Design a protein with these regions (language model features):
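Active-site pre-lysine segment of PLP-dependent enzymes
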Residues: 1-66
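Alpha-helical scaffold elements within enzyme catalytic domains, especially in hydrolases
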Residues: 9-10, 122, 133, 170
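Short beta-strand segments
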Residues: 20-23, 58, 72-74, 147-148, ...
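Conserved core segment of the aminotransferase class I/II
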Residues: 43-124, 136
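Conserved C-terminal alpha-helix-loop-beta "cap" of PLP-dependent enzymes
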Residues: 80, 84, 154-174
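Conserved glycine-rich beta-strand-loop-beta hairpin in the small C-terminal domain of fold type I
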Residues: 116-131, 143-158
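Hydrophobic alpha-helical bundle segments that form small-molecule/ligand-binding pockets
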Residues: 137-143
Length: 174
């Protein structure tokens, strides 16, 4: 939450500075009982007096079909009005058939949540296997740290200074 507030409180020198906020993993939870919730940046920017500073993006590209999902943009009215001016001449229209496919398949937010539970059932064992190996092989050695995410699709690993090239080389050997 503190990081979101710090972004919202930025006072950039350039009047057209914008934050492009990719909220890609908002619904990608691995566990029903442990779900990270990020503070909502649009309202925080508005509270901080910078309602036009952020464009927030989301899509179903990691929910349904990569490259064939549907996407959305959230921002201030002024930003959206400005964006509509250029979007009107950049595209002949949205893929309404694909939008209809998504609506018919999911029906509502509960359908999306149930679908994401299926994703979690596939992803959770993979995350847990990687975390188990990291802990068994590297835990307690003080040579690296890693995240234990509650969602998303990545585990971040931080190694000791100067080890990245050797780690990448070892990964290529595997």
């Amino acid at each position: 939450d503190e990081t979101v507030r710090r972004f919202a409180a930025l006072t950039p020198a350039a009047p057209d500075f914008r934050i492009f906020w990719d909220n890609a993993y908002a619904i990608h939870h691995l566990y029903d009982d442990r779900q990270d919730q990020l503070l909502e940046i649009l309202s925080e920017c508005e509270k901080a007096g910078h309602p036009d500073m952020v464009f927030e993006f989301c899509s179903t590209s990691k929910v349904t079909f990569a490259g064939a999902g549907i996407a959305a943009i959230a921002s201030s009215k002024a930003n959206l009005d400005d964006m509509r001016k250029s979007m009107t001449i950049q595209t002949i229209g949205y893929d309404k058939i694909n939008q209809l496919r998504h609506v018919r398949y999911f029906k509502d937010i509960n359908g999306v949540r149930e679908h994401m539970k299926k994703h979690a059932a596939i992803m959770r064992p993979k995350f847990e296997a990687v975390l188990k190996v990291l802990e068994e092989e590297l835990g307690g050695l003080g040579i690296g740290t890693w995240t234990k995410p509650n969602g998303g699709y990545f585990i971040s690993f931080d190694s000791m200074e100067g080890c990245a090239k050797a780690i990448v080389a070892k990964c290529k050997e595997a």
